[in-house]
Amino acid sequence: MSEKKNKKERLADEIEQEELNILDETEETVEEEAAADTLTEEQAKILELENKLDEVENRYLRMQADFENVKKRHIADRDASQKYRSQSLAQDLLPALDSFEKALATTSDQEEVKQILKGMEMVYNQILVAFEKEGIEVIPAVGEQFDPNFHQAVMQDSDENAGSNEITAELQKGYKLKDRVIRPSMVKVNQ
């Protein structure tokens, strides 16, 4: 009987040992799974942070490019403003210049009138020199081909000596500031 009892005790010890082994293995598996879950969560967090970093870097680069574009546009606007700063003044002076031209077109035999006209011509020439310094110039007209960008046709002519679409007379001078037309020339164009 004692052998049976020993066998039972050994068997019970073996079962208990087996249960402990299984319990240990289960605990190890749970710990490994927990560690794997933690690792997976950390990897997911790292991936999420990397994506956010990429997004922020892209936004930064776009903002930097936008800033550069605004800067270039500002410089271009400032340059254009500087380039065409005298346009308004020139437009205001053109009627006075036209009046000078009409006055200078008159003739007189009186010495006083001739002296006044000479003084007016000097003032007129000074205005033209000031215009030239600012880049304002007369648009060529008579003998040129009609260009709707620079000329405004107000009359037609039928001169056999002039070519087709050639300007035969200028009724009012046109002016341009650098590459911008301030006032187109009013012209008579041959058919």
Swiss-Prot record:
According to its UniProt entry, the protein's GO biological process terms are: protein folding
Task: Recall the GO molecular function terms of this protein's record.
Answer: adenyl-nucleotide exchange factor activity; protein homodimerization activity; protein-folding chaperone binding; unfolded protein binding
Among the Pfam families in the record, one is GrpE
Keyword Cytoplasm assigned to the entry: answer is yes
Give the record's GO CC terms.
cytoplasm
Please give the superkingdom of this protein's source.
Answer: Bacteria
> Where would you find this protein in the cell?
Cytoplasm
* Keywords noted in UniProt: Chaperone, Cytoplasm, Stress response
Spell out the PANTHER family in the cross-references. GRPE PROTEIN (PTHR21237), GRPE PROTEIN HOMOLOG, MITOCHONDRIAL (PTHR21237:SF23)
Q: Which family does it belong to?
A: Belongs to the GrpE family.
**NCBIfam families registered for this protein in UniProt:** PRK14140.1 (NF010738)
Q: Could you give the subunit structure recorded for this chain?
A: Homodimer.
Known function: Participates actively in the response to hyperosmotic and heat shock by preventing the aggregation of stress-denatured proteins, in association with DnaK and GrpE. It is the nucleotide exchange factor for DnaK and may function as a thermosensor. Unfolded proteins bind initially to DnaJ; upon interaction with the DnaJ-bound protein, DnaK hydrolyzes its bound ATP, resulting in the formation of a stable complex. GrpE releases ADP from DnaK; ATP binding to DnaK triggers the release of the substrate protein, thus completing the reaction cycle.
Record protein name field: Protein GrpE
User: What organism does this protein naturally occur in?
Assistant: Listeria monocytogenes serotype 4b (strain CLIP80459)
Q: Tell me the name of the encoding gene.
A: grpE
